[in-house]
Amino acid sequence: METVPPAVDLVLGASACCLACVFTNPLEVVKTRLQLQGELQKRGTYPRLYRGFVASVVAVVRADGLCGLQKGLAAGLLYQGLMNGVRFYCYSLACQAGLSQQPGGTVVAGAVAGALGAFVGSPAYLVKTQLQAQTVAAMAVGHQHHHESLLGALETIWRQQGLAGLWRGVGGAVPRVMVGSAAQLATFASAKAWVQERQWLPEDSWLVALAGGMISSIAVVAVMTPFDVVSTRLYNQPVDGAGRGKLYGGLTDCLVKIWRQEGPLALYKGLGPVYLRLGPHTILSMLFWDELRKLAGWGQHQGS
């Protein structure tokens, strides 16, 4: 893999993930609706407005129009830029310091970088979740916040809940991205090396990065989905006058309530759309990042 300065990795990582976000945001809208459907209700006791991936896409388009599939895109792009810029910058610093050469170092570096990125990007993810949950009353699932735009949502939350309100739900976001980042970066590097060792593809081919991203995406979805469901619930729940969540007290409380009231399988709600969103996003992000790093490395060689 090409070596580039951490500051360059910040720009490349943010750019790669923003590019991927443009393609995968419709899947994020569907995933959010499915994860909020039947909140804290036993299976079979609530109307299923969204059923599976294709039917859910149709339901979103009927309720919100074709543009409804790109709800929350601005917030999503802001989140991807902030979170992944910080994440790839910190990961690059760790690799530069030699941590990735130590046993388990890639996992640790990926987890720490993911935690820092999740904290920085949390306000954008909060708004993204709330915007994507919004729809007409007949198709509404979860609490409806009635925001008009990204900036309007940030202003409303700031005015009503203060600075702390912008980071509400961060307790669920940090472990979510920690496990996802550790799985993604560790398995991508290992998968790429494994594919290259077998010489199935030319060593510098973009197909190597594509194969690595596909393998990595399976690991990411497997470990990240329960935390993804919890994060969606924490970010979208209504709050009281003191800014405290009305439904969940935090990560552990949310996990326990979902398990007890909806059953353990509810932690994998929307698994199909989750993979259809996180899978392509992981594949595209890692592919774009790897190819942009090659271009940056080539540019450095040409300039020297």
UniProtKB/Swiss-Prot annotation:
GO terms for biological process: blastocyst hatching. Its main location: mitochondrion. GO terms for cellular component: mitochondrial inner membrane. Keywords: Membrane, Mitochondrion, Mitochondrion inner membrane, Repeat, Transmembrane, Transmembrane helix, Transport. The gene is SLC25A34. Putative antiporter that exchanges dicarboxylates and sulfur oxoanions across the inner membrane of mitochondria. It is found in: Mitochondrion inner membrane. It is a multi-pass membrane protein. It catalyses: a dicarboxylate(in) + sulfate(out) = a dicarboxylate(out) + sulfate(in). This is Solute carrier family 25 member 34. The keyword Transmembrane helix applies.
